[in-house]
Amino acid sequence: MISKFSLFVEIGRVVVINYGEYINKTAVIIDVLDQNRALVAGPHSGVERHIINFKWINLTPLKVNIQRGARINTLIAAIKAADLETKIAALSAVKKINARATKSNQTDFERFKANLIRRKLNKKVSGEVKKLVNIANRAAHKKAVAQKAAGHVKKTL
């Protein structure tokens, strides 16, 4: 049977912490302690080596090649060898976290300017949609008139 899961909890898996002291930071699983907890460390993001519950982490597709229970210096070397910093920055989860942080740090005037830009864009899009609908309606009307003239009237309810 083929599994529908593609991400597994394993040694070296990069995770994003979603709860607690290190929220929105990335770490690497160093050891799996039991069915609920793992030992993680994130020297690249300031996460100290500690035990964390699986409910507090989100798995990412990235994986570092390390041994079980690796020391911090070994982990740092593996992170540098895998060029993990750039790969982490390209993750969609990290991009969402950064976007949410910048949006929450906006001033009132910046929110106002963004709202104006959004309104202007929506007005352009809705105008183009109206033009396309109008063209489609005209074509349908011409087709109906042509069919009526030919004697093929199709009634719709």
From Swiss-Prot:
The record's GO CC annotations read:
cytosolic large ribosomal subunit; extracellular matrix
Domain of life of the organism in this record?
Eukaryota
CDD domains the record matches: eL14 (cd23702)
User: What InterPro entries does the entry give?
Assistant: Rib_uL2_dom2 (IPR014722), Ribosomal_eL14 (IPR039660), Ribosomal_eL14_dom (IPR002784), Translation_prot_SH3-like_sf (IPR008991)
GO molecular function annotation: RNA binding; structural constituent of ribosome
Keywords on record: Ribonucleoprotein, Ribosomal protein
Pfam families, from UniProt? Ribosomal_L14e
Q: Which GO terms describe its biological process?
A: ribosomal large subunit biogenesis; translation
The UniProt family comment states: Belongs to the eukaryotic ribosomal protein eL14 family.
By what name is this protein known? Large ribosomal subunit protein eL14
Protein source organism: Dictyostelium discoideum (Social amoeba)
Q: What is the lineage of its organism?
A: Eukaryota, Amoebozoa, Evosea, Eumycetozoa, Dictyostelia
